[in-house]
Amino acid sequence: MWIQVRTIDGSQTRTIEDVSRKATIEELRERVWALFDVRPECQRLFYRGKQLENGYTLFDYDVGLNDIIQLLVRPDSSLPSTSKQNDAQVKPSSHNPPKVKKTARGGSSSQPSTSARTCLIDPGFGLYKVNELVDARDVGLGAWFEAHIHSVTRASDGHSRGKTPLKNGSSYKRTNGNVNHNSKENTNKLDNVPSTSNSDSVAADEDVIYHIEYDEYPESGILEMNVKDLRPRARTILKWNELNVGDVVMVNYNVENPGKRGFWYDAEITTLKTISRTKKEVRVKVFLGGSEGTLNDCRVMSVDEIFKIEKPGAHPISFADGKFLRKNDPECDLCGGDPDKTCHMCSCHKCGEKRDPNMQLLCDECNMAYHIYCLSPPLDKVPEEEYWYCPSCKTDSSEVVKAGERLKLSKKKAKMPSASTESRRDWGRGMACVGRTKECTIVPSNHYGPIPGIPVGSTWRFRVQVSEAGVHRPHVGGIHGRSNDGAYSLVLAGGFEDEVDRGDEFTYTGSGGKNLAGNKRIGAPSADQTLTNMNRALALNCDAPLDDKIGAESRNWRAGKPVRVIRSFKGRKISKYAPEEGNRYDGIYKVVKYWPEISSSHGFLVWRYLLRRDDVEPAPWTSEGIERSRRLCLRLQYPAGYPSEKEGKKTKGQSKKQGSEATKRPASDDECPGDSKVLKASDSTDAVEAFQLTPQQQRLIREDCQNQKLWDEVLASLVEGPNFLKKLEQSFMCVCCQELVYQPVTTECFHNVCKDCLQRSFKAQVFSCPACRHDLGQNYVMVLNETLQTLLDLFFPGYSKGR
């Protein structure tokens, strides 16, 4: 096994070869010292967010093949002297205020009573009086909200005329039903001297700053407003016979969802239509204010709530005359904002009661509110911590492994045979223990027949690569199958000396009969084999009734289930058809017959199988197969990150061995041509054999007009041979599931998405294309592209079976 070590800045990367998964972190530090010239005490090693500590192995941290470990070089001056310095944590400041839930319409104990705000106070200047009810325009939304004058001051030199800055330079943002604002309350003293109206001082009012407070959003605090964003509170509802086309009125409209109640905007009436005695329609042009412009042809949902816009100088009103509050979009769609109705979404998530808002805590993760006395266990007071998480979102600190701490015990690893064995054998160096780095998903694991894109003659250096390609899934097992279905693939590795291999036909010995207790991979035969498990699975591939006594012979051997056969270099000792290095895919075989017999090598009963080749592709040891492998540029495939020096040494050693064998004996006539030579990239001088399309595939590609641009790009890679299928898979990959698209829906923006994936997107109220975010609309009809589905089934037979 090999791993990579990279500096934290990414400037240097080194490969550590021949490392065991059982290697300790101390041994790894020594290897890093030799490569980076960094002493072990100056190293901080990280893998997947964890700091590697001494006393553990790479297996404890699940370090796999070709994984990257990051190296942080610790300066000598900052070497920790005690463990406390390593575990020092930056504590959050305790003076930060706790997060307490505030209700939008709930009153605060610090607010003055309504009776104290009923008296209008004339400050002696300005158009509006203190405590006067007004409508204030949100400069960001252009909507009008109910407010009252808190105080009136003269504009200083620091204020810009014509603008509406917020107090202390703070900013605020309001969405439908919510206000987010940070500001301090105004502390100016009011001159409690009543005076008369001052409505004729409009010209001098531009130098006056009005400090207002929203009636329904007291948590926004005191805001500074200019006179152009204020007007007297709307109080008159216009009747149907009072409405005229061209009038500018105030209507309720939801910009994001026109079918629901929203905010209040100025609008010009464009259409008045009487549909029936009780049903009327009003269409307006909504003024959003600022740079937002207008919205044309907007239908008003509440035709019986159209307000007259009051002009400056209108009769002033206060809370003594009434609240004059209009209906806005409810803060909660579940309860409609009803203060008397329990709701677990907008109030306490535990009890649902809308009481004691000052005793509610907001979770910093899910944003749900909880009463401190509804928690388990209940809290006596609001905590002083800056961040608080509810019981559902809180991470158990005992499960978090901090830097410098020891790993938590894994129940899964404690049950492994390697955890209880007393053997000192270093099993961590084997490639069978590294695990897959990727998985074949183009076809399901129970797929019969060839794997799309894997031609006969493909060779891999290690068995784990064969598993990643999907040709033979097990890392170690010789047969892959299911006892109630059949066998899908097998590896011919020469495990029994009395097996016979004739190339197109060979005998295969079943599995079992060996003592593999503990963590053993091989063992001497110690019992008779039985026709169960994988032996039974392989027997089911024979076109004959199952017989676990004397076996059976197929009635028509070509009618049996196909088996993918991989020949391993280990079988070279008994077969000249095996490759000299690696594991080679030799095509499809069928089971001709199976029978029990006593093995001549160890004397126990074994089950034998006779398999015969049934593949249209030529065998890799024939002259046609060698030529085809050369045309397809098939060569020995190494894993990603495999050391090039090791590859060069192996190639050099093989050439010497082949030369010595050539001088010892001449090649016999019955020896297979080419002797399963593995081609290198330098051996290929001709162009790669182009991928051939069938007439049916060509016709269907012409019919798929929606994806013509994609097909033009894909067909350009036909000259690359087997790589054509890889290009095809990448081009028609679903952006949602990252798999080859299944039951494709070609959108109007010419992107292909799985129908199930698009339905899940629509179910989540996302009505746009997952690839480009083009708006498809809520009523979009998903039409299955059957032509594309047929094409993909032809190029990748069996891929839709497991979807």
Swiss-Prot record:
Its main location: nucleus. It is found in: Nucleus; Chromosome. GO terms for cellular component: heterochromatin; nucleoplasm; nucleus; pericentric heterochromatin. Pathway: Protein modification; protein ubiquitination. Residues 195-289 are annotated as: Interaction with PCNP. Mostly detected in several tissues, including the thymus, spleen, lung, adrenal gland, and ovary. In addition, found in several tissues in the brain (cerebellum, hippocampus, and cerebral cortex). The keyword Ubl conjugation applies. Homodimer; disulfide-linked. Binds methylated CpG containing oligonucleotides. Interacts with H3; the interaction has a preference for the 'Lys-9' trimethylated form of H3 (H3K9me3). Interacts with PCNP. Interacts with HDAC1. Interacts directly with CCNE1; the interaction ubiquitinates CCNE1 and appears independent of CCNE1 phosphorylation. Interacts with CCND1; the interaction ubiquitinates CCND1 and appears independent of CCND1 phosphorylation. Interacts with p53/TP53 and RB1. Interacts with UBE2I. Interacts with ZNF618. Interacts with UHRF1. Interacts with FANCD2. Interacts with ATR. This is E3 ubiquitin-protein ligase UHRF2. It comes from Mus musculus. The gene is Uhrf2.
